[in-house]
Amino acid sequence: MMEFLMVFIISTVSAAVFTLFIRNILRSADIGDKPIVTEHSHKAGTPTMGGLGMLLALLLVTVLYRNNPYLVLTSLIVLTAAIVGLLDDLLGLKVKEVQRIIRNVSEGPLEVGQLVLKPGEEARAATDKAKRDVEALLSEGLVEVVGEAPIKNEVSEGEKILAQLLIGVFLVLSGAVGKLGGFYLGLAAAPIAIAGMVGAINAVNLIDGMDGMAAGIMLIASLSCAIFLGLSGQALPFLALAGMCAGFLVFNRHPASIFMGDTGSFALGAGYATAVMLTDTVYFGVLAIAVPVVSVIVSLLHRAGVIRLPVEPLHHTLHYRGMSERRIVLLYWLITLIVCALGLYMTGSIL
């Protein structure tokens, strides 16, 4: 028990220390976020790439507990994913284009792109259709330009998916994945493992949109997986992941003084997926991140035109409807905690 506690404590403390160090470096270099959501304009300049602090904490724990193969392989996958995320974050330091933010000054609703703006509401003209609509509405005096949003350079969606697929292939080639869901599948496990890797990375990346949301959810999920495993040697990767989330939350909770960026979200998603597949906790592992999974499904349905959100992803829609950021984050944490507690109770992991 003491070993498990020490892994969590070392990971937590080192993540907090490294994150503080990274934050100060980024501040001195004037490297900060450029929000594209109007309501988040007050966060402009907040250092990003805080995932580097989380990564350093995990690597430290891995060096100290290098005899645990589950932890070592998880760290290798995390390092690979973090490098991909870091490249995307570095590209994001340059602005690709500046998009106009407009406000509906008419007396009725207006269609701008896929959105329907009520009187007084604001939106960013992001798509080609939205830009054409704005030009027409401006000429009629129905909207006014109230600001501009810098759009960052980034790795294309196709390139991101390719990189995530390669990370999944790396895991499969390690030979550690063959049994999933209690069944030995051999090579048949490969496509499932790769799809799981891509899904987990994108799920964590999607919910990393509000202060403390991703780190808090993954802290709860990782600790729950460790408890599900009975705090055995297989639980060490989850305890290390939970600790680095806890340490990062010291500076990422509302109001956040640093963001994890794609460096952190890619690393966290890949690390969680790896730990789940290495320890064959697939069913419980997916259940534990039900909130991110549902968020991804909702976004996919929106993009497919099955449902229509005023703003994507779902948590931004809740914010758009008037719910405060802090309440949304607490709601997502609470749902995750309840789902994990029910899962642990139903599996007999807790009384």
Curated annotation (Swiss-Prot):
Membrane topology label: Multi-pass membrane protein
Listed EC numbers: 2.7.8.13
CDD domains associated with the record: GT_MraY-like
Top-level taxon in the UniProt lineage: Archaea
Catalysis: reaction(s): UDP-N-acetyl-alpha-D-muramoyl-L-alanyl-gamma-D-glutamyl-meso-2,6-diaminopimeloyl-D-alanyl-D-alanine + di-trans,octa-cis-undecaprenyl phosphate = di-trans,octa-cis-undecaprenyl diphospho-N-acetyl-alpha-D-muramoyl-L-alanyl-D-glutamyl-meso-2,6-diaminopimeloyl-D-alanyl-D-alanine + UMP
EC class of the enzyme, as a word: transferase
Localization per Swiss-Prot or TrEMBL: Cell membrane
Protein name: Putative phospho-N-acetylmuramoyl-pentapeptide-transferase
One GO CC term, this protein: plasma membrane
Database matches in PROSITE patterns: MRAY_1, MRAY_2
Names of the cofactor(s): Mg(2+)
GO molecular function term, any single one: metal ion binding
GO biological process, one term: cell wall macromolecule biosynthetic process
Pfam families linked to this entry: Glycos_transf_4
Residues spanning the membrane: 2-22, 44-64, 71-91, 158-178, 181-201, 212-232, 235-255, 258-278, 281-301, 328-348
Family: Belongs to the glycosyltransferase 4 family. MraY subfamily.
Keywords for the protein's UniProt record, in alphabetical order: Cell membrane, Magnesium, Membrane, Metal-binding, Transferase, Transmembrane, Transmembrane helix
